[in-house]
Amino acid sequence: MEEYEAQLLVVEQALENAADEAQRQDLLALKNNLQELLALTRDTEDGAPTDELPQQGDDLDDELQRLRSELNDLEAAGSSQTALDEERQLADLRTKYTAMVGEKCSAPHEHSWGTCYHNALICGVDDEVVMSSEGVLDARLRVLFTNPTHREMLPCSYYLEGECRFDETKCRFSHGALVTGSSIRKYNPPDFHKLCRSRPVFALLPDRLWHRGRVLCVNFVEQVCRVRLDGQDHKERERDFKFEELYPLTTDQEEDDELSSEESNSSMNNESSDEAESDMDDLEEARRARMVELSLFTFKPTERLGAWEEFTRGIGSKLMEKMGYIHGTGLGSDGRGIVTPVSAQILPQGRSLDACMELREAANGDKDYFSVERKLKRAQRRQRKADEKAYVRESQRVDVFTFLNDSVLAPGESSQQGEQVAKKVKTNELQQHSTKTLNVETVRIADEIRRKQRDMAKVKQSLDRNSGDAQLQKRLQVQMQSHKQELATLQAQERSLSKEQQTRKSKNKMFEF
């Protein structure tokens, strides 16, 4: 009886934990059989004769053995069904995670002070199966952090190329961190529109690590931001970074930390009235800084800022920057003034305003019709064209020096040829030049003639001194012949100039009365 009651208790417990409907039906049938068997056993013990007891005992043993075998079969079927469910769940997880390979996510990383989430790239699925704290099966993913802040998070460049000689435990860099799939969060893309003064950011330095800092000023036109780094030397603390080298910290956790720190600071500062006044000043400065940042978002210049200082070395912008002006904001203490300079307008002299408006309407309402800059550019274009024409005219013009050098001083001509060329010089060519130019050229040619005569005298002395050397005599004869040809050419040129000067003097005498 006690064994039957124990078996009935086991069946009732199994019935409470059973989830499959077919298994529950089998357990209910077994429970009914046990209850009937217990009822029959009690009736038999009360009114059965003593000679039938051994036979009934054998029947009870057979029934108990059959009950045990059925329980074992049910337990084996339940365990096999559980194993199949776990394998199916694990296969679905692997299929899901394999499809996520190559996607960006936010993965946890264990630091000495706790766990922090960083953006990462899923690069593979690990073969090992893990069990969560709730008893749920899960797979592990291998991720590479895109914004590493510590050496152990920095991806190994040799591992990415497949050439790393160290395994994962011995390499100083990361071969990919293993994280559970359930701990993966959504990727947080950088939002550069939230860059503002005192915004915490991560900045990329040459060591390939992202260091923490705070924004000092932002230039949304050139997409450059100045950041004050935390924990750096004084000389290298403030640097300029491009937007792609920054990651704004805009998570809810950062905002909660900032709010909690502000609340604690405000509670401490409220202890004295002087500190309260300083807080009001800080709030006012923050409000003005926020207005400047809002103006940066809406500023869309049509031209490069400071283009009017192209020829002034930018002294105006430098002075304004010294006085606290931020590029891209408007003028004034609140940054609500104009951004681009006022263009100067020059109206036609002696015309009424109505006539000027009619001229502007005739030009299709052009606002820059009377602009000084446009007139200056038009004058510059006109002057440039005039300079080009003057250059072409001067390049085609032939003066007396060029004409004489090209026509008379041509190389390889004999003295007779020089005289013939000099005779063929046209009078109208020389008549194009002034008397002063002819006088200067005459003096120059006279000096050249005297120089050639001195050279010829030196060569003649050398000939007389070295009469016994045949080779030297030959070279000196060639030099003498060359000097004679050049002297003949210069003399012919001098005669042409003298003739022109004499002609002009004769004409002047003819015109005098």
From Swiss-Prot:
It comes from the Eukaryota. The keyword GTP-binding does not apply. GO terms for molecular function: DNA-binding transcription repressor activity, RNA polymerase II-specific; RNA polymerase II cis-regulatory region sequence-specific DNA binding; zinc ion binding. One of its GO terms (cellular component) is nucleus. Residues 478-495 have a biased composition (Polar residues). Coiled coil: none annotated. A zinc finger (C3H1-type) spans 155-178. Residues 312-358 form the G-patch domain. Residues 262-271 have a biased composition (Low complexity). Residues 252-282, 478-513 are annotated as: Disordered. It is found in: Nucleus. SMART domains: G_patch. It holds the Pfam family G-patch. Residues 496-513 have a biased composition (Basic and acidic residues). InterPro entries: G_patch_dom, Znf_CCCH. Residues 252-261, 272-282 have a biased composition (Acidic residues). Gene3D superfamilies: 2.30.30.1190. Keywords: DNA-binding, Metal-binding, Nucleus, Repressor, Transcription, Transcription regulation, Zinc, Zinc-finger. Transcription repressor. This is Zinc finger CCCH-type with G patch domain-containing protein.
